[in-house]
Amino acid sequence: MDCLIANINENDQFLERLKESESLLNTFYQYDAMSPESFEQALNAPNNGREQELASVISNYMSDLELTEAQQINIDKLKKGAKVVIGGQQAGLFGGPLYTFHKILSIVNLSRQLNEEYNKEVVPVFWIAGEDHDFDEVNHTYVFNTEKAKLHKVKYHTMTPPESNVSRFIPDKDKMLEALDDFLVQIPETAHTNHLRNEVQHIIKNYASWSDMFKALLHIVFKEYGVLLIDAQDPKLRHLEKPILKEMLKKHDEVDRAFRQRQAETVEAGLAEMIQTDTNVHLFLHEDDMRQLLTYEDGHYYTSKSQTAYTLDELLEIVENTPERFSNNVVTRPIMEEWLFNTVSFIGGPSEIKYWAELKAAFDVLDVTMPIVLPRMKITYITKRIEKLLKRYDINAEHVIADGIDNDKNKFIRAHASEQFLNELDQLEAQQKETYERLAAEVQGNEDNKNLVEKNNQIHQSQYDYLRKRYFINIERENAISMKHFRELNETLHPMGGLQERVWNALQFMNEFGTDMFSPSIYPPLRYTLKQIIIKP
């Protein structure tokens, strides 16, 4: 595989400010993410003392997987106090969008670099957001149908979506297999298709919960890198979290005030407001088979749907006896993660690193240190077919990745149009406009005639627009194959108006290049970068 680094204009000014180590922006974080001194400081920070228990919890969570030597070594390193680079994602159907894989690759590569550059043990950890309950965000994925040159939505269909954590959801295996068939039927059969189908079918048949299927897929793909996996909703992890859960309940008012004040400060500094929540407790409680947000009012805590009232002592008793009933919201999840791990750096998506800027004061209330916050690497894949089409039409890949295909498509259509036809049409339109201006001047004193002329002019002008539009449409029809190629380029490099990794699913590339395409022996070695990476398999 070839690997290129591309300079693509960022529409996101936040990332540019981060790259430039803007002092105002850095006030909202613990560390300057661009400073080597920050890494030195984070790597040498004292550990929290929970590493042995945490390593035991992770080992237990991954016990249903066949661990590689690299994973077992990393569990041992974690137990002995190794720092971590961590990131996480919701459990998407068949792994979800490509950026999930790219987050893990970012975590792996930054961990390796820190090992090499600072001679410190750093372990890659991926946090599965199994506590989340928004099933609509994870129940579907997309596959590109080459024959039709369009994206196809593949969805797990259910009449009873879970109202609890995704980790508790047990999907229907037949419906999961149907979704897999729907995915694979859209793409060409290759030498790798049967193996890919068998791998995913094995996962569906041998794992029960939605997030465990997700875990098993990630393990197959990234086990050789030594990546450690943990589900936020793992019961043993919740038991380890009992002390901080109690503090979150006791100090919920301080946490809420600190968060809202810091959020107001970020908005005042010109940043967009990222977190929107009405709760003042920032924790969920599992009750009546539903994940319910807690809110505090008049001395009691109330569940959002059942409206059950609890005292603080009653909730603290639940924490002590069944902590797995609790889960975090967007405000407390990052704090929980960093309370557990000795983290050097958190790797997040663009939105994640923005909303972390609103949380520094909440971290401080609970005496938890915010790690270095960095965005995941952005990676786009250009296959030989796509590269061939780019060369055929003399199109710059970086322009399409950033802005889409419309400019190149319009140039192509214009190049196949008759300049004489268009020039004469323009002249005719201009002549008619002048004629109507003279007619309007002649009837200026009569309002009815003036309106009549204006209306008639509009009708004729719209006919010129229609003629021009239909003329270009007919050119598109005459060049239907090229138009299909342009759609293919756009849906591959700029799908849905954004980056490939936000839409495409990794299984599509694994079908073409092998289920082991992401393994260390095949995937190109990367160094962590904020620039766009282009990989040509």
From Swiss-Prot:
GO terms for molecular function: ligase activity. Its EC number is 6.-.-.-. Keywords: Coiled coil, Ligase. Residues 417-457 form a coiled coil. Belongs to the BshC family. NCBIfam families: thiol_BshC. This is Putative cysteine ligase BshC. It comes from Staphylococcus carnosus (strain TM300). The gene is bshC.
